Amino acid sequence: MSSQLENEASFEATTLGFLWRQFTRPKPLPTGITLAGQVAIVTGSNVGLGFSASRQLLQLGLSHLIMGVRSQAKGDVAAAQLRTDFPFATISVWIVDMESYDSVCAFASRCESLDRIDIVILNAGLIKTPYTVVRATGNEVTLQVNYLSTALLTILLLPILKAKKRVDCSWSPVISIVGSDLMYENEVELEGPVLPQFQQEETFSQFSWYGKSKLLQTMFISKIAEFVNPHDVLVNVSNPGMTGGTDFFRGYPALMMKLIAVGQWILARPVDMAATTYLDAVLVQGEKSHGSFTSDWTIKPYPKIWYTPEGQQLRERLWEETMEELNFVGASKIVNDLKRS
């Protein structure tokens, strides 16, 4: 449905568009939703938005929560809090380090052991300074975590969710990748290779690169959705908006943290409110959101560039480069098999 919203894309890229989104009133979930018997995976779930979304899923009766986290100790602390409040749910802590392809592959392989998977929220992400390269892959860390490893985990999980779909269920399992409306304000170079643009240290800017990584993410999801029948697995992007009360900016200098805190006090959503956008994406929006960008409890347009011939060419080059980067797991074959089967 995002593909049909070109007329709204220009507005979303304006300051007024940002303010309109931030002050949109949340829509409550429909009454009667129960997740009894269901299994959900939430990455980056030991703090902030991921933790809040996990709690809200459990409040709806979720039977089994898998918390995908980087630190076992921190994951165990968060899980203990949830187990106290939800003693009848099974809460598991599994390690996934989004800087490591091996860790991502191991996490996906472990998911095959589950009897069912109904909901996946890929929330793990970062914004980091200074410019940092992941030694094992040679990629800049923002690109690695927010885009490449997230794309890899999506590709690996799609056939697993499809295979484990319950024949007695009227709904499809869903993967929602957490995006950002900063993609509306950031563009990549339209000519030449896409991924190497993130290897240019001299042009590094943490906020710009974060927005660009989320732009690539949305381009990727809009493409991979073409290979997946939404009746098998639904895939979309969910944007929580500017959110306060998270650890997202941990590690920043004290002065910058104070400035960020002032901006968040004025504009940011409380974390529990922002996390409801995740639940809206996986429980409410349904088939019309397949391959789309969800934000503010509705479906929003892609960035303006997506609707242009140059943007479509960019999307195709990005797709080809991503498949080449991830073909060590047979990414192209996995995706093509999804379309054929």
Curated annotation (Swiss-Prot):
Catalytic center residues: Y210 (proton donor), K214 (lowers pka of active site tyr)
Residues where NADP(+) binds: L49, K74, D97, N123, Y210, K214
Pathway: Secondary metabolite biosynthesis
Regions annotated as coiled coil: none
Pfam family, one: adh_short
Keywords of the record: NADP, Oxidoreductase
Name of the top EC class for this enzyme: oxidoreductase
An example Gene Ontology molecular-function term: oxidoreductase activity
E.C. numbers: 1.1.1.-
Similarity-based family: Belongs to the short-chain dehydrogenases/reductases (SDR) family.
Function: Short chain dehydrogenase; part of the gene cluster that mediates the biosynthesis of virensols and trichoxide, fungal natural products that contain or are derived from a salicylaldehyde core. The pathway begins with the synthesis of the reduced chain in virensol C by the highly reducing polyketide synthase virA via condensation of one acetate and 8 malonate units. VirA has interesting programming rules since the first 2 ketides are fully reduced, the 3 following ketides undergo beta-dehydration, and the last 3 ketides are only reduced to beta-hydroxys to yield the trihydroxy portion.
Name of this chain's protein: Short chain dehydrogenase virL
Native source organism of the sequence: Hypocrea virens (strain Gv29-8 / FGSC 10586)
Gene for this chain: virL
